[in-house]
Amino acid sequence: MSEKLLYEALNEGIHEEIERDPKVFVIGEDIGHYGGSYKVTKGLFEKYGNLRILDTPIAENSFTGIAIGAAMTGLRPIIEGMNMGFLLLAFNQIANNAGMLHYTSGGNFTTPLVVRGPGGVGRQLGAEHSQRLESYFQSVPGLQMVACSTPYNAKGLIKSAIRSQNPIIFFEHVLLYNIKENIPQKEYLVPLEKAELVRSGNQITILTYSRMRYHVLQAAKTLIEKGYDPEIIDIISLKPLDMGTISTSLRKTHKVLIVEECMKTGGIGTTLKSAILESLFDFLDTPIMSLSSQDVPTPYNGFLEDLTVIQPSQIVEAAEKIILYS
């Protein structure tokens, strides 16, 4: 085991896959000598050169299109968005090309690529740089989405994503890059379509992902002190959802709370609600409650920024309300 920060775990995973497979390359802005805006690609340019680590101009639509074309020929590009919000400039390429080409070509082409980068609220980056694009990408046919939350799952997921035949949107949170954890030195993979049972419990199922995993864990300490027994699941796979793990939990607890940083309208929480109501309605003893960010542009002011995002105290209040519902 060795202690790694989350960004170091991602770096190590990418390094191993470039070493393992000559078809893997990285493309994006400032990923070369600079090492990426959050140092995820640090040291890769020096080792692999400019044919494997491609520094680009500020032109998201162009370098994303280049990467998709490369994927169509059998290469495995890793596209880094300096910020997830910037990838809106490449939405046409990601949606109409990467997501749909396998279908629209009658199976003649695949687009094995990873689109990754930082996003989320918490560093006073303003509205444009605090985007959470889960709601944008989840409606695009052909795309898979995962969100890492620990150094362990970050490394295992990025390796699995690079090896996948599908286009993967890989969400990283700006506030999680410096999370520390001991991870195995021996190679391992984390499945792309599997949720993680973070804590076993019997009274309520709390579904969450990314940064909100830590807000939920903080809230769980208070709930446990009050005598409650919450079950916590990090869904990890945002598309497709791991309904098997979710179903097993809800058939035990019969109560569910969804906690996300994505905005309420059209977010992952809305999709989860729909999926649960369609397949698990008979197992619910209470209405589903979902806690999401407010439908407002993220303020620059730090105090106001915090007000837009769900806090641990709100999770405690909501969980108690559901557990005591009659």
From Swiss-Prot:
GO terms for molecular function: metal ion binding; pyruvate dehydrogenase (acetyl-transferring) activity. Its cofactor is thiamine diphosphate. The keyword Flavoprotein does not apply. It catalyses: N(6)-[(R)-lipoyl]-L-lysyl-[protein] + pyruvate + H(+) = N(6)-[(R)-S(8)-acetyldihydrolipoyl]-L-lysyl-[protein] + CO2. K(+) binds at L113, A161, I162, N166. Thiamine diphosphate binds at E60. Pfam families: Transket_pyr (PF02779), Transketolase_C (PF02780). Heterodimer of an alpha and a beta chain. Its EC number is 1.2.4.1. The gene is pdhB. Its main location: plastid. This is Pyruvate dehydrogenase E1 component subunit beta. It is found in: Plastid, Chloroplast. It comes from Chara vulgaris. GO terms for cellular component: chloroplast. The keyword Nucleotide-binding does not apply. Keywords: Chloroplast, Metal-binding, Oxidoreductase, Plastid, Potassium, Pyruvate, Thiamine pyrophosphate.
